[in-house]
């Protein structure tokens, strides 16, 4: 009876370890999906390391990324933001090798929104790999996004 109990306990431990390894594997697959053209939701800490550390560089714009990006300041309750969201998701996939698309929920990241003076949403930052960003307010059409991406972010005519 004791051996049967020990065997059962070992089986339970092995099952837990294998489930834990599976969960870690799923996380890394999700991380790869983000790198392959998904829209990435940022918090303040992520923004400071991936986009612009305004606490360290208060007088000069220094982009922290290596690919051009779009940053969408949005809210879940915002109608125009809901129109822009699927367009950005589609563009993140279409331009997955060229740009990164980020989203920042202004209700969750009030300090970050205040740092950029966000007063209306959606507000979009178009950030080239080198140079200063451009800002756009309001819902843009897919054609307007494509124009901004190609001409401003990627420098195509």
Regions found by a protein language model. Give the residues of each.
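Thiol-based oxidoreductase modules, predominantly thioredoxin-like and allied folds used
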Residues: 73, 84-92, 96-111, 118
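N-terminal targeting signals for export/organelle localization
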Residues: 1-48, 156-157
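A short beta-strand-turn-helix
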Residues: 43-68
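C-type cytochrome heme c attachment motif
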Residues: 76-83, 123
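Loop/turn elements at helix/coil->beta-strand transitions in domains of secreted/extracellular proteins
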Residues: 66-69, 97-99, 129
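Short pre-active-site segment immediately N-terminal to redox-active cysteine/selenocysteine motifs
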Residues: 66-69, 73-77, 120
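Non-catalytic, surface beta->alpha helical segment in thiol-disulfide oxidoreductase systems
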Residues: 120, 125-157
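Structural micro-motif
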Residues: 68, 110, 116-125
